[in-house]
């Protein structure tokens, strides 16, 4: 209780006692299956459109005959969104033997020409490479042009001059071939640094370069071999020497015109034009940078002079990496191999990229361990990248439960609380479908859509009906429904039609009906969008075998001859319990039960007395009144639609002593008008119509 000690006006907030219950979503869907790419560990990813699905999981694929029947998920996801589904979680199943494409990038310096190798009339000794980093007088280079499969190498030539203003490098002798920039890689003998920061050389420009880092596709699959990774040198900080500090060269303290974008641990290039040194920054104080390493000699740096070629430039050495796959592109700039916050390449790439991951191979010791593209800028991920060596088994789809965030397959959907609809498109084995049913029954608030097995080749007459009945007879649950036959879609991968499991499209219809009409409306007599036909035509007489209780097989029907398209023509669960035969009744109870569970959490640990019982009863009654007014419950008035009871008659003293609050709720769900019967008889004055 508050204390009132001094005369004043006290404004206090009070609890009104009314705790409204908000209805939960029933259209969030979870799919499990093989995809072209995407994460197979961690939490299933949410996608809200097919475009977003392709960004994470890729598009349609054909991994060859070994994986026939395991490529349904991308088509199902497309069908889900075509039928106006909006929230889809995907758990990727990884085939055995799948691996990620990768490459060990090399350091040193390899670059490209940005202008054809002849910069004068006729052949000359001038070239313009894409970068001058590490290139100085004495550096040896070799130009290699690969055009139309023909490889042309220049002689190994030494650099005799470097023009920083134009980027032109002078070689010791003229080139004997016109090296075209778009086809030419420039190999150098740049290797690393000595203890004083001077550039060391390889035995030759084509000698083996030091390993730099490993670049891998973000996840398994041959898609990674199509990744395009490019690396470019860049400098975040660029400065010109202004003066030494009191002539104290030995202290390695140098004043620059500007120290913008200089930072501790940056590798800087000390560029005198024809010679270069590289040092790390120990400190940046105003315009003064302090460098690591032995004392610098007087000739290593020079203040700004009249002659441009004598100016000493200080440039930080970073790199930019781009990764491109299909229409996706990522770019990371200002990267360093040193663990500099906000710049360290491992953190910057691995924490943000959906295309690649990088691994450091050794502690950085010099800036020429920056990755250098095999063709100057481009790095090919040429190792691994397998979609798998065998088709996934039932256990791969069912998955393993290693705890939160470590589950796989169907088990991974446990980590996503809001899922209400579950499907494993195209997988019809009894083990997998039993696992789906157990999953939904154990989690209570989920419903499984089961696919029919593929049609046999040249079956005897009636075999389809026998097959689907035999499949349905394996199950008895109020938490699943099965649909027959499979649908036919346009396969954009092959420009032909193909039969497809219907669960993805039907899950989209569930979501569409939930959003537009409500979960109490049966997801039947609804158009299936995005299809061109059905694998088998089922007529009314055949449906009279499949539909009645306890068979309860939902049929997809072709009504195009009646100008009504292709429709779902069934709304039953695969159960022998007549009370739960309708899908919408089961899912309405899921909606109401979960909404009450979530909406009454506030009552836990409240004093368990009449006041609490009244408040909880009021909250539930107000919620059920809204449900009734939406048309989900029978009755012309609320008392006929539901009752809520929470008092001494629902709890014993033992219940109270053990902390139990027990409420009894009864509802009268609306059931679908599955059989519309019009009875007509003769009447002297006209006709009489009775609708039941």
Where are these regions (language model features)?
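Autoprocessing Asn-cyclization modules and mimics
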Residues: 97-180, 191-215, 222-301
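Long, low-complexity, polar/charged, intrinsically disordered or flexibly structured peripheral segments
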Residues: 361-406
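Short, cationic low-complexity segments
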Residues: 237-240, 342-346, 685-692
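A short, surface-exposed interaction/processing loop segment used at functional sites
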Residues: 321, 333-334, 346-352, 455, ...
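Structured, hydrophobic secondary-structure cores that serve as assembly/anchoring elements
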Residues: 1-107, 133-137, 142-152, 163-164, ...
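Short linear interaction motifs
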Residues: 192-213, 388-417
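Short amphipathic beta-strand/extended segments with alternating polar/hydrophobic composition
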Residues: 114-115, 154-160, 203, 224-232, ...
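Surface-exposed interaction regions enriched in Ser/Thr/Asp/Glu
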Residues: 180-189, 299-328
């Amino acid at each position: 209780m508050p204390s009132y000690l001094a005369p004043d006006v006290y404004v206090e907030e009070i609890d009104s006692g009314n705790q409204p219950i908000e209805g939960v979503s029933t259209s969030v869907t979870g799919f499990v299956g093989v995809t072209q790419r995407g994460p197979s560990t961690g939490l299933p990813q949410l996608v809200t459109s097919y475009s977003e699905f392709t960004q994470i999981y890729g598009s349609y694929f054909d991994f060859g005959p070994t994986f026939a029947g395991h490529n349904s998920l991308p088509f199902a996801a497309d069908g889900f969104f075509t039928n106006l589904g909006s929230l889809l979680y995907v758990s990727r199943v990884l085939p055995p033997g799948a691996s990620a494409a990768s490459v060990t990038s090399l350091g040193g310096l390899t670059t490209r020409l940005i202008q054809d190798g002849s910069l004068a009339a006729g052949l000359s000794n001038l070239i313009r490479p894409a970068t001058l980093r590490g290139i100085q007088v004495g550096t040896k280079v070799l130009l290699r042009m690969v055009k139309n499969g023909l490889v042309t190498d220049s002689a190994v030539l030494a650099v005799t001059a470097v023009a920083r203003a134009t980027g032109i490098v002078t070689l010791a002798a003229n080139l004997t071939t016109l090296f075209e920039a778009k086809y030419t890689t420039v190999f150098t003998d740049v290797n690393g640094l000595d203890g004083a920061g001077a550039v060391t050389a390889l035995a030759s420009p084509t000698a083996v370069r030091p390993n730099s880092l490993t670049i891998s596709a973000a996840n398994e699959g041959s898609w990674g071999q199509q990744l395009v990774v490019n690396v470019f040198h860049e400098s975040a900080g660029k400065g010109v020497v202004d003066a030494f500090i009191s002539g104290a060269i030995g202290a390695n303290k140098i004043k620059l015109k500007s120290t913008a974008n200089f930072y501790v641990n940056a590798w800087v290039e000390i560029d005198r034009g024809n010679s270069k040194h590289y040092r790390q920054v120990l400190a940046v104080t105003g315009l003064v940078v302090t460098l690591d390493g032995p004392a610098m000699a007087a000739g290593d740096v020079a203040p700004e002079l009249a002659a441009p070629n004598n100016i000493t430039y200080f440039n930080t050495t970073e790199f930019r990496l781009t990764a491109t796959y299909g229409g996706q592109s990522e770019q990371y700039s200002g990267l360093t191999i040193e663990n500099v916050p906000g710049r360290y390449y491992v953190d910057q790439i691995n924490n943000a990229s959906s295309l690649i991951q990088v691994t450091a191979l050794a502690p950085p010791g010099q800036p020429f361990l920056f990755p250098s593209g095999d063709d100057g800028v481009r790095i090919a991920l040429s190792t691994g990248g397998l979609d798998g060596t065998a088709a996934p088994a039932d256990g791969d789809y069912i998955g393993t439960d290693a705890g939160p965030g470590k589950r796989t397959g169907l088990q991974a959907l446990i980590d996503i609380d809001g899922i209400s609809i579950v499907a494993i498109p195209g997988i019809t084995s009894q083990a997998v479908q039993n696992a789906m049913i157990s999953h939904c029954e154990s989690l209570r608030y989920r419903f499984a859509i089961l696919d029919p097995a593929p049609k046999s080749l040249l079956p005897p007459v009636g075999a389809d009906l026998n097959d689907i009945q035999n499949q349905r007879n394996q199950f008895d649950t109020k938490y699943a429904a099965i649909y027959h036959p499979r649908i036919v879609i346009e396969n954009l991968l092959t420009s032909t039609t193909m039969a497809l499991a219907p669960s993805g499209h039907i899950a989209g219809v569930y979501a569409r009906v939930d959003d537009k009409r409500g979960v109490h409306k049966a997801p039947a007599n609804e158009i299936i969008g995005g299809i061109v036909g059905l694998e088998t035509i089922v007529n009314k007489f055949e449906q009279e075998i499949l539909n009645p209780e306890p068979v309860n097989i939902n049929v997809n029907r072709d009504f195009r001859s009646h100008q009504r398209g292709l429709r779902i023509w069934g709304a039953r669960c695969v159960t022998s319990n007549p009370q739960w035969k309708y899908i919408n009744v089961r899912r309405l109870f899921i909606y109401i039960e979960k909404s009450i569970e979530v909406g009454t959490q506030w009552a836990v640990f409240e004093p368990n007395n009449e006041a609490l019982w009244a408040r909880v009863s009021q909250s539930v009654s107000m919620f059920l009144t809204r449900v009734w007014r939406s048309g989900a419950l029978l009755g012309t008035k609320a008392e006929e639609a539901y009752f809520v009871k929470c008092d001494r008659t629902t709890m014993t003293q033992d219940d109270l002593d053990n902390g139990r609050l027990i409420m009894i709720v009864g509802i009268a769900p609306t059931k679908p008008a599955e059989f519309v019967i019009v009875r007509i008889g003769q009447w002297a004055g006209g006709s009489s119509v009775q609708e039941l």
